[in-house]
């Protein structure tokens, strides 16, 4: 027998303060999340990338991945981007990406509302009254002229034979005027 005594390793003597690091599966999930975030960044335009809090080395790695055309080379470069993402402010980047995604949904919804308003203006004269009540400083003569021209354009488009391109100039001009009113 040995001269020094060893304490038995049992649950009562187990000190888990030494093992407070995340387990291997958790680390792997985090690395895959960073890799997925890196893949999203590779799909962004250079202008959008410049708006993110990225280190220059990470920015250049992303741009290189965007330029790489070979499948395996691109995969390797994206994995390198994922590795560099470990030191990047991932939460700030995710927050900005979410803002861009949700902001574009809001913009799309606003565009749909304007399109519906334009359709109401073309079919219902009372819709113009509602627009003018919400925007008392709007140029009523200009709006009426645009509505008249868009209605005339729609009537001319209805008379076109199949295969002819319809005119949309006044239709678009009315939309732009409504967009400027809402801005």
Swiss-Prot record:
Keyword Cytoplasm: yes
Annotated compartments: Cytoplasm
Biological process per Gene Ontology, one example term: assembly of large subunit precursor of preribosome
A GO cellular component annotation in the UniProt record: cytosol
InterPro entries cross-referenced by the UniProt entry: DarP, DarP_sf
Region ranges (Disordered): 1-27
Signal peptide residues on this chain, from the entry's feature table: none
Keywords, ordered alphabetically: Cytoplasm, Ribosome biogenesis, RNA-binding, rRNA-binding
Biased composition (Acidic residues): 9-18
Magnesium among keywords: no
GO molecular function: ribosome binding; rRNA binding
Principal cellular location given in the protein's record: cytoplasm
Similarity remark: Belongs to the DarP family.
Record-linked HAMAP family: DarP
Function noted in UniProt: Member of a network of 50S ribosomal subunit biogenesis factors which assembles along the 30S-50S interface, preventing incorrect 23S rRNA structures from forming. Promotes peptidyl transferase center (PTC) maturation.
This protein's name: Dual-action ribosomal maturation protein DarP
Primary gene name: darP
